[in-house]
Amino acid sequence: MTKEVCSNIGLWLLLTLLIGNYVVNLEASHHVYKRLTQSTNTKSPSVNQPYRTGFHFQPPKNWMNDPNGPMIYKGIYHLFYQWNPKGAVWGNIVWAHSTSTDLINWDPHPPAIFPSAPFDINGCWSGSATILPNGKPVILYTGIDPKNQQVQNIAEPKNLSDPYLREWKKSPLNPLMAPDAVNGINASSFRDPTTAWLGQDKKWRVIIGSKIHRRGLAITYTSKDFLKWEKSPEPLHYDDGSGMWECPDFFPVTRFGSNGVETSSFGEPNEILKHVLKISLDDTKHDYYTIGTYDRVKDKFVPDNGFKMDGTAPRYDYGKYYASKTFFDSAKNRRILWGWTNESSSVEDDVEKGWSGIQTIPRKIWLDRSGKQLIQWPVREVERLRTKQVKNLRNKVLKSGSRLEVYGVTAAQADVEVLFKVRDLEKADVIEPSWTDPQLICSKMNVSVKSGLGPFGLMVLASKNLEEYTSVYFRIFKARQNSNKYVVLMCSDQSRSSLKEDNDKTTYGAFVDINPHQPLSLRALIDHSVVESFGGKGRACITSRVYPKLAIGKSSHLFAFNYGYQSVDVLNLNAWSMNSAQIS
């Protein structure tokens, strides 16, 4: 550890002590209460840490939630995040700050933004970074004022020559945007400003999540100088009945290829670009997106046919995943997606272990060639952690009811890629017309239920005798009798993940838009208490949190399996043990 990093940690701890003396407690639901209760935990984390991850981002201790303001500046990646310096539960929120040169290994810095003025004295909530045309980064974030109103503030670096951006200052003009009697904004539901974009009229635009009664909406503000903002008469988009829109994100994607697009770009001509509007629904705690067209004249987002911005929209991730945020990586011409994964353990367990929350591995995100969905894939940099590759698992036949153990890999901290080939598609069961909810299907037809084709996939974090395991698998159905159209279902079944009873063991599911006549790919990033699964080369993603009692460390096992009636071929299986990332 460098002298500079040690100094940073010292400053971080000093600020933590100072901050802890006056920051108020807030509840995790984002409600602010006049009478606050003690919800902090000051004891040291438990020495026994079987569930702490090896290569996912998480601070040394305490609560973490939303990723904030990710960006690249002078070749350095920055990740800010919502952090409680006083305990492993939500409250006392500040903007913690870490930097990296590769998105995998991270060094900490003192908190960048913390309550210090009337416009944020009751909390510094989520926001985003924008790189101005002169290369200067600025942050817009939500502050909680003395009246517990949500207002929007700006902060900028004190020293632009510092690539680590270790010190930030707040504008005396704050708050820049606030609810009042004229604009009629809901003062308790006005938060999480996006990265701003520059229109062709040279005005900046930013959207902020809000609601009016049950109408969720993205309020638009415009500005000529990034300091004086004016509310637009109409929102960028809204939906009646969806409830509060948190952590909105709005960005362009190219229709051709996987390269990213700068947020203010409109393409030449505009037809080569589409736009993505993503929201985090407070009611469901899931992230949804729609693909559509941005009307630059009316400042309106128009979803493509088949898309609706509500709970029926496609999701980034069908598991434990929320409050996501993208940024354009100008160094590698890609768009990167961050997302927060909360715990599935009890609050008491979180307090005992001394921490709560991780960030998923950053993902490259782009538009599928069909134009109907987004593709996600872990950034290439994570592959540098691969070691001890298991090879030559090719052309294996998995007969009905069989398992194939993968030896020679550290199964509790691994990266696995497998390619399946299905035989006899005509043997698939017919899906019931009422089966429209993939999670419900996966829950009712868990891994022990046989069907014509499936379940087949991977058993991860498994104990030797299968008292515990998490299964990630496919099933294939016919769309209807005598049909040559098929439905591919992907499940992540946590029901047998732990002998411990008080964990959330929800089973997750997603339909995968792929052709089952072609090989089916499945990738799993396994990291002690988290499993990130990518089906169909990133067309469906499911993140799970699990806490085995037996299948920990060297006692964890990995299997490929087929419990369907028909045989399945493993065309190729590669597995790697993963080194730990350097995350301080």
Curated annotation (Swiss-Prot):
Substrate binds at W63, M64, N65, D66, Q82, W90, W125, S126, R191, D192, E246, D282. Changing W125L: Loss of activity. Disulfide bonds join C442-C491. Expressed in seedlings, leaves, flowers, and seeds. One of its GO terms (cellular component) is plasma membrane. The active site is at D66. Changing E246 to A/Q: Loss of activity. The keyword Iron does not apply. InterPro entries: ConA-like_dom_sf, Fructan_Metab_Enzymes, Glyco_hydro_32, Glyco_hydro_32_AS, Glyco_hydro_32_C, Glyco_hydro_32_N, Glyco_hydro_beta-prop_sf. It is found in: Secreted, Extracellular space, Apoplast; Secreted, Cell wall. Induction: By wounding, aeroponic growth condition, darkness, sucrose, glucose and mannitol. Glycans are attached at N159, N186, N342, N446. Keywords: Apoplast, Cell wall, Disulfide bond, Glycoprotein, Glycosidase, Hydrolase, Secreted, Signal. One of its GO terms (molecular function) is beta-fructofuranosidase activity. The keyword Signal applies. Belongs to the glycosyl hydrolase 32 family. This is Beta-fructofuranosidase, insoluble isoenzyme CWINV1.
